[in-house]
């Protein structure tokens, strides 16, 4: 029983222990279930978070890929832009180089155009100077004939300088005329650097014709002295066309006129040109009293025409007294109404009209007789037929010599009242012949500027005038011209008389050529009294500034003869030599080409 009770007790204890273990197991199971549930929840939460993180990572990765793609695109775009900019940079560099070259070309073109403009300005000024030097024989510029705009320019120019048109009292045909010098000054283009400078002496002198007088005192150098001495070198064709046609008058038949072309100094070519130059209509008694001339010099065969044209334009501008004397003398010359005593009434022509023309036929060959027609557009009708001596008198001085010859003015006064020679004065002369055989304005301008003095006994060693020296250097040979056979001007020769200048003719405007008969009867000594060696300064000043006359009187002295070597010495003046003229010709040819 004890064993049963012991077994019962063991059994009870085992049951208690079993229930305790079961209860403990149940707790553990419950705890395990709760823990598992918790872990499952945590796992799910972790999975959700993992999914979120994974999604996030996926989004980040997609974003990264998108950004990488964008970066790649941007990189490509930047590369393309860089390439484009490089191309544009290269293109701009090429354009810069091209523009630089264009700028250089433009600069060169501007310089060239500036030089051309300067050359054109100088050429225009040269044309204006040539217009001042040109002859207007029979052709007068009228305001009504000029273009309208140019009329306004001329009127403004003349009003600006206080000038007016010539008065109708001078001549009805020239009441509306405009001096050539004014047209030249209007056409002249001034230097841009000197636009504000004052008027030059030459322009003031050109416009002095409205004042009526020149300022007294020594004259300033003319533009004609500087520029116009080589006018023919600029444009010989125009000068040859503008030059007045020469007329040949044989001594045996003074009514037969033939032209003389002085483009070559060979006598044979001259004669052939003379025979065909003028039509038969000119062969009439238009120049009954104009005398013959001499053979042309062949010393400078190719340069003689140029030297003649040079001296033709050595005095150019028309001034106040020139305008008045020119118009008055031309009115008197071409007036149809005065009787025959108009020119013969003066006592100064009593001896000139009594000249004998008998020796003329024996002294000069008929083929070389020639004189000049001052105005081809107007016909000469002299009231009476003057003698050879009077015919040689320039028409410009026929009215001047009617004035009292005893009035003598001081040198400075005469230099103020008289004016330098102009082309218009040369146009009114019959162009006596120099020893070089040229019936040309050269002879007159040479005598005008070279000869000055009233004493016939003086040698011509005072001739240091630049114009005279230039003329001597270009127009006279070393002795070839003076060695020709016929060296006598027929109008000077009188029957049985030795001719020279009369020292008593103190009021003669200028000493002309003073001829004296040589031993063989046809040698002519030409006396040109120099201003520096004249014993009468007053008369010398007057003579050197008045128009020259070719007058000889019978009361002459044979002691006044000069040999050809003495008559034409080589002066040491400041004029141009032949070499200098040729050099200038080459220079002007180069510039104008």
Swiss-Prot record:
What are the GO BP annotations of this UniProt entry?
evoked excitatory postsynaptic potential
- Location(s) in or outside the cell: Cytoplasm; Membrane
The UniProt keyword set, sorted, is: Acetylation, Cytoplasm, Membrane, Methylation, Phosphoprotein
**Alphabetized InterPro entries for the sequence:** Tjap1/BEGAIN
- Report the residues modified as Asymmetric dimethylarginine: 381
Entry membrane topology: Peripheral membrane protein
Q: What is its main location?
A: cytoplasm
Q: Name one GO cellular component term.
A: synapse
Q: How does it assemble?
A: Interacts with DLG4 and DLGAP1 and forms a ternary complex.
Q: What does this protein do?
A: May sustain the structure of the postsynaptic density (PSD).
Q: What is this protein called?
A: Brain-enriched guanylate kinase-associated protein
């Amino acid at each position: 029983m004890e064993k049963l009770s012991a077994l019962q007790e063991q059994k009870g204890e085992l049951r208690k222990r079993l229930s305790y273990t079961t209860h403990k197991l149940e707790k553990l199971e419950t705890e395990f279930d709760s823990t598992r549930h918790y872990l499952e929840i945590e796992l799910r939460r972790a999975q959700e978070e993992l999914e979120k993180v994974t999604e996030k990572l996926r989004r980040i990765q997609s974003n990264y890929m998108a950004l990488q793609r964008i970066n790649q695109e941007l990189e490509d775009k930047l590369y393309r832009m860089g390439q484009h900019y490089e191309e544009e940079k290269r293109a701009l560099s090429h354009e810069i180089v091209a523009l630089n070259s264009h700028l250089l070309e433009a600069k060169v073109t501007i310089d060239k155009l500036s030089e051309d403009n300067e050359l054109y300005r100088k050429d225009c000024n040269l044309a204006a100077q040539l217009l001042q030097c040109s002859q207007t024989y029979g052709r007068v510029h009228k305001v009504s004939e000029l273009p309208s705009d140019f009329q306004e320019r001329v009127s403004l120019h003349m009003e600006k300088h206080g000038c007016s048109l010539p008065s109708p009292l001078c001549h009805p045909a020239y009441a509306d005329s405009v001096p050539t010098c004014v047209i030249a000054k209007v056409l002249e283009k001034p230097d841009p650097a000197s636009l504000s400078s004052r008027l030059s002496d030459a322009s003031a002198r050109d416009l002095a014709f409205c004042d009526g007088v020149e300022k007294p005192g020594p004259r300033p150098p003319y533009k004609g002295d500087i520029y116009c001495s080589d006018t023919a070198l600029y444009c010989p064709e125009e000068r040859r066309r503008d030059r007045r046609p020469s007329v040949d008058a044989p001594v045996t038949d003074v009514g037969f006129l033939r032209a003389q072309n002085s483009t070559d100094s060979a006598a044979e070519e001259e004669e052939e040109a003379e025979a065909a130059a003028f039509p038969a209509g000119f062969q009439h008694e238009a120049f009954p009293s104009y005398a013959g001339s001499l053979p042309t010099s062949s010393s400078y065969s190719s340069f003689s025409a140029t030297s003649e044209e040079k001296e033709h334009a050595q005095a150019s501008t028309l001034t106040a007294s020139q305008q008045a004397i020119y118009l008055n003398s031309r009115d008197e010359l071409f007036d149809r109404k005065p009787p025959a005593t108009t020119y013969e009434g003066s006592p100064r022509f009593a001896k000139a009209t009594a000249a004998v023309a008998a020796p003329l036929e024996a002294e000069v060959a008929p083929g070389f007789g020639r004189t000049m027609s001052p105005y081809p557009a107007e016909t000469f009708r002299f009231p009476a037929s003057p003698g050879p001596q009077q015919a040689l008198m320039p028409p410009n001085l026929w009215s001047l010599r009617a004035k009292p010859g005893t009035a003598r003015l001081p040198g400075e006064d005469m230099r103020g009242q008289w004016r330098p020679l102009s082309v218009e004065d040369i146009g009114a002369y019959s162009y006596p012949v120099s020893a070089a055989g040229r019936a040309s304005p050269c002879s007159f301008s040479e005598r005008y500027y070279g000869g000055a003095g009233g004493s016939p006994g003086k040698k011509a060693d005072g001739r240091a005038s630049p114009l005279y020296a230039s003329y001597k250097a270009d127009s006279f040979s070393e002795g070839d011209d003076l060695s020709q056979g016929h060296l006598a001007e027929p109008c000077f020769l009188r029957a049985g008389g030795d001719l020279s200048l009369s020292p008593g003719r103190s009021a003669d405007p200028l000493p002309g050529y003073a001829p004296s008969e040589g031993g063989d009867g046809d040698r002519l000594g030409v006396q040109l009294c120099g201003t520096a060696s004249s014993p009468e300064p007053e008369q010398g000043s007057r003579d050197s500034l008045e128009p020259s006359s070719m007058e000889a009187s019978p009361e002459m002295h044979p002691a006044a003869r000069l040999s050809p070597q003495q008559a034409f010495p080589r002066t040491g003046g400041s004029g141009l030599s032949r070499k200098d003229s040729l050099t200038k010709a080459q220079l002007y040819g180069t510039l104008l080409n």
